[in-house]
Amino acid sequence: MVKHIVTFKLTGTPEERARVAAAFRDALLALPSQIDVLQSMEVGINENPAESWDVVLIAVVPTLADVAIYANHPAHVAAAGLLAGHKADRACVDYEFCCRRLSRQYGERGLGIRSGCL
């Protein structure tokens, strides 16, 4: 399994950043039902004004190749388009992890079983 973690720094006033972040979050949270390779999606909006990053997403896909499938899917491209003109910076980390403990939580749904890490 692969975790795809992305943080975003947005431009604009605090109110504008909050509005854009909420719309982006809502669009991202709809993606698992639209993109087959997307096992899960978590999105957080920063609540600490002392920190400089506004949004983080954590997506789980079976393989590193699936990150590209997810990234190029039209639904993801549309969600990413919501940040047009509002994105100051982006940082990303993709890493493989073994989901043995997740498979206990999710059972035969296949987290990890399909990717062979068990």
Region spans (language model):
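C-terminal structural segments of small proteins and small subunits
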Residues: 64-93
